[in-house]
């Protein structure tokens, strides 16, 4: 969605070349990405990446033959979600030593500093003051949480299935975070039905043996908070990108609408 990707054939071996645009250099810490990307590959969660330049963000990835990104339809199926949970469990319980923490609120501050026309955020809707106030109320949401290695951008396009093996790709936003953040992302980005979302959370909790009944209810609330905060962040992210001439159609509006809908459901 933010990079130019080119399929290359080098001596009979296929690779995907990623060329980031100029705006991305301000939005992404490529040193963190390169470090985390390598760890994920060594753990068998990521595809082979022979080149990832920490300064330019140029990346060369081995092309996986007979592979496909997951669709929203697939991600609403229990068999597929079970496989996703297996990868999440491996990631969140890995011995990775990610050097960075991914915070929605720190990212928001960075993006907002890059937004030249600040009113593009506050004048987007008459309810923005309320939305902003509630958003910042959740800044301490992870204060008592043990942060674990997370992908933080598990859109369907970043989950690649080759035969029966699932890969998580594009680790640009990876870092330490609440594991529920990854689950919230999948629910939001794949537009999971209530049944599928419940199955995803229950399967994850059963596999990790992490939550008893009360904690499970709290987890449901945290998921809504994470989803709300994600929509606010990606709305702002879109406004920054649009200032630099990129066209995202009604993507920003959809993000904002989703945030307001979740705002009404928040505890």
UniProtKB/Swiss-Prot annotation:
Q: Which GO terms describe its molecular function?
A: ethanolamine kinase activity
The organism's lineage is: Bacteria, Pseudomonadati, Pseudomonadota, Gammaproteobacteria, Pasteurellales
A single Pfam family it belongs to is Choline_kinase
The note filed under miscellaneous reads:
Lipopolysaccharide (LPS) is a glycolipid that is a necessary component and antigenic determinant of the outer membrane and has been shown to be an important factor in the host-parasite interaction in a number of Gram-negative species.
Q: Name one GO cellular component term.
A: cytoplasm
Record organism = Haemophilus influenzae (strain ATCC 51907 / DSM 11121 / KW20 / Rd)
GO biological processes:
phosphatidylethanolamine biosynthetic process
Disulphide linkage map: none
Signal peptide (UniProt feature, chain positions): none
**Similarity annotation:** Belongs to the peptidase S49 family.
Q: Read off the InterPro entries from this record.
A: CcrZ_PhaseVar_Mediator, Kinase-like_dom_sf
The role this protein plays is: Mediates phase variation of the LPS epitopes. Phase variation of H.influenza LPS epitopes expressed by LicA is determined by a translational switch.
Name of this chain's protein: Protein LicA
């Amino acid at each position: 969605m933010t990079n130019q990707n080119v399929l290359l054939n080098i001596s009979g071996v296929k690779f995907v070349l990623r060329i980031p645009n100029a705006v991305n250099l301000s939005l992404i810490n490529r040193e963190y990405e390169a470090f985390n990307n390598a760890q994920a590959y060594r753990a068998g969660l990521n595809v082979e990446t022979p080149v990832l330049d920490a300064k330019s963000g140029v990346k060369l990835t081995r092309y996986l033959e007979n592979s496909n990104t997951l669709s929203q339809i697939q991600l609403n199926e229990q068999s597929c979600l079970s496989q996703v949970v297996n990868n999440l469990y491996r990631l969140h319980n890995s011995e990775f030593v990610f050097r960075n923490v991914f915070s929605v609120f720190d990212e928001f501050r960075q993006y907002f500093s890059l937004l030249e026309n600040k009113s593009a955020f506050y004048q987007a809707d008459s309810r923005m003051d309320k939305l902003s106030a509630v958003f910042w109320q959740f800044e301490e949401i992870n204060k008592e949480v043990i942060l674990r290695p997370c992908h933080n951008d598990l859109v369907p396009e970043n989950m690649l299935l080759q035969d029966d093996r699932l890969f998580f790709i594009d680790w640009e936003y990876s870092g330490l975070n609440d594991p529920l953040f990854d689950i919230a992302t999948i629910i939001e980005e794949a537009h999971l039905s209530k049944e599928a979302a419940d199955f995803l959370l229950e399967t994850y909790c059963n596999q990790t043996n992490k939550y008893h009944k009360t904690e499970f209810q709290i987890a449901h609330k945290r998921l809504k908070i994470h989803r709300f905060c994600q929509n606010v962040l990606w709305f702002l992210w879109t406004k920054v990108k649009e200032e630099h001439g990129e066209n995202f159609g009604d993507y920003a509006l959809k993000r904002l609408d989703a945030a307001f809908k979740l705002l009404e459901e928040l505890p």
